[in-house]
Amino acid sequence: MLRVSFEQLLEAGVHFGHLKRKWNPAMAPYIFMERKGIHIIDLHKTILKIDEASSAIKQIIRSGRKILFVATKKQAKQVVADKVSFVGMPYVTEHWAGGMLTNFPTIRKAIQKMTVIDRMAHDGTFDLLSKRERLQITRQRAKLEKNLGSIADLKRLPSALFVVDVMKERIAVSEAKRLDIPVFAIVDTNSNPNGIDFIIPANDDATSSIEVILNAICDAIIEGKEERMMDTSINNENKEKTVSVFRKRTKIEGRSKKDSLS
């Protein structure tokens, strides 16, 4: 896996926390010092936490499960969409619809509605509608795409959540906890880390900070997928060997029976 260096984190500004007066005391173990009224995050601990999170994420992906990324703040939207779509994971960057996890069956219905509209556009049904009906459906499709487009392929609840800024995404975190879904999160010095399963202490306001962490996480996802492919290949090879041995044994036993009868 890609191991982020101290220098990379420093250059990306990962160490910059919030003003001392805005801090959450629960983040004290991850604070190195205070400089000019601003808390400085201990990057050695950040590296350890990135490694821990990366290892856990790789195992989740290796087992064939999905991780849902949530980042609706301006500084994180684009970088998360770019990085996460590249590795084929679902993400929410526009708006967290309440009940997206706790009321997942309803969300699935909305996704299915998108699928129906897309099918109408492809099979010609759309052309049979009036101009007004087409406009209404097009607007409806655009709204669904904005809110749910990136999770359209999510057939079941995700196995984990990765969150940028636990304060802003508190509803998503709350829903995940209610369903016992593990939460990975970039947590700044003004946030409460309690209840977060995998804490990555870091600046969650700078795009450069978010990006350098996502690079490591996405690399772990790629490795997890590669190892899953290898596991599948080995399993298929073992199955073929087992079938081959079984067939040979069956032939030998068949010959033995014929010999004993003759």
UniProtKB/Swiss-Prot annotation:
PROSITE patterns reported in the protein's UniProt record: RIBOSOMAL_S2_1
Keywords: Ribonucleoprotein, Ribosomal protein
SUPFAM superfamilies assigned to the protein according to its UniProt record, in alphabetical order: Ribosomal protein S2
Keyword Zinc-finger listed: no
InterPro entries in the cross-refs: Ribosomal_uS2, Ribosomal_uS2_bac/mit/plastid, Ribosomal_uS2_CS, Ribosomal_uS2_flav_dom_sf
A single GO BP: translation
Entry keyword annotation includes Ribonucleoprotein: yes
GO cellular component: a single term: cytosolic small ribosomal subunit
GO MF entry, a single one: structural constituent of ribosome
Any Pfam family the entry gives: Ribosomal_S2
Family according to the record: Belongs to the universal ribosomal protein uS2 family.
HAMAP family recorded: Ribosomal_uS2_B
Protein name, UniProt field: Small ribosomal subunit protein uS2
